[in-house]
């Protein structure tokens, strides 16, 4: 699933039954990326990534 939130590009995908991969980009800059051993749905994890973007926008120094 790909989308935009507060100007950032968010990507969340399910890789097999066990893992979710995720990435957040702001103007081509990778804010965060990785994987999670989660049973959450892609849509639920995408919503969680919105809170990560909110934190990044409030505290960009924490993501340098």
Predicted stretch roles:
Residues 14-31:
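Short aromatic-glycine-(Arg/Gly/Cys) micro-motifs in beta-strand/loop hairpins
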Residues 29-64:
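Mixed-charge, Lys/Arg-enriched low-complexity segments
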Residues 10-12, 24, 53:
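Hydrophobic aliphatic residue packing
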Residues 1-18:
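Short N-terminal "domain-start" leader segments
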């Amino acid at each position: 699933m790909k989308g935009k939130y507060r100007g950032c590009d968010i990507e969340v995908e399910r890789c097999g039954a066990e893992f979710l991969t995720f990435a957040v980009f702001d103007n081509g800059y990778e804010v965060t990326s990785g994987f999670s051993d989660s049973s959450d749905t892609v849509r639920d994890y995408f919503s969680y990534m919105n809170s990560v973007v909110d934190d990044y926008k409030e505290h960009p120094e924490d993501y340098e």
